[in-house]
């Protein structure tokens, strides 16, 4: 596992979930965070590599990093608004 400098306020496990469920769960989870909070989203769906960055851009959240592990992806998202 890659080391990251981000300390998430919440971790959302979306492994084995297909589009659009990871994006819907991400939207719900980020709505509960304070501004400046960091959400880590873990996904196995390859479509999430396009879907989650598109969602962050559309909603004005900040995608800090995408980490690709052997079996999953980790997205670090900072709540901006």
Model-inferred region functions:
Residues 9, 36-40, 72-74:
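Intrinsic-disorder/low-complexity, polar/charged segments enriched in Ser/Thr/Lys/Arg/Asp/Glu/Gln
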């Amino acid at each position: 596992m890659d080391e990251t400098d981000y300390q998430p306020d919440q971790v959302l496990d979306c492994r084995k979930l297909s589009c659009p469920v990871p994006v819907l769960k991400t939207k719900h989870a980020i709505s509960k965070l304070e501004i400046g909070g960091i959400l880590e989203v873990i996904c196995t769906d390859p479509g999430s590599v396009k879907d989650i960055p598109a969602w962050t851009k559309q909603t004005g959240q900040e995608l800090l990093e995408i980490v690709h592990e052997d079996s999953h992806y980790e997205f670090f998202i900072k709540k901006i608004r």
